[in-house]
């Protein structure tokens, strides 16, 4: 038997109680009397997780990963020059160059 350790949550619009629904799925609107999230960078209202990181990154002009080793593309296709970060992507790409038949009739 599964027991919930968290208290029941109430929907902000309907008032129903839920025991196994995450808070972000209850109701999408902010309940009355509760201030919506605000960006600490620009002051824009309504910025909430999971878009918070992306919003702040956009406002500050940062890229998702600023480390060179994260952006490095280690696998380069010799016939066409395309580069790939992952071996699996490279392997799929090089199949047509090798003349390998992917599917049998």
Swiss-Prot record:
- Tree of life domain: Eukaryota
Its organism's taxonomic lineage begins at:
Eukaryota, Metazoa, Chordata, Craniata, Vertebrata
The entry's keywords: Metal-binding, Zinc, Zinc-finger
What organism does this protein naturally occur in?
A: Homo sapiens (Human)
Q: Name one GO molecular function term.
A: zinc ion binding
Family matches, as InterPro entries: Znf_C2H2_sf, Znf_C2H2_type
Q: What is this protein called?
A: Putative zinc finger protein 861
Zinc finger regions (C2H2-type), where? Answer: 75-97
Gene that this polypeptide is encoded by: ZNF861P
- Gene3D superfamilies (alphabetical): Classic Zinc Finger
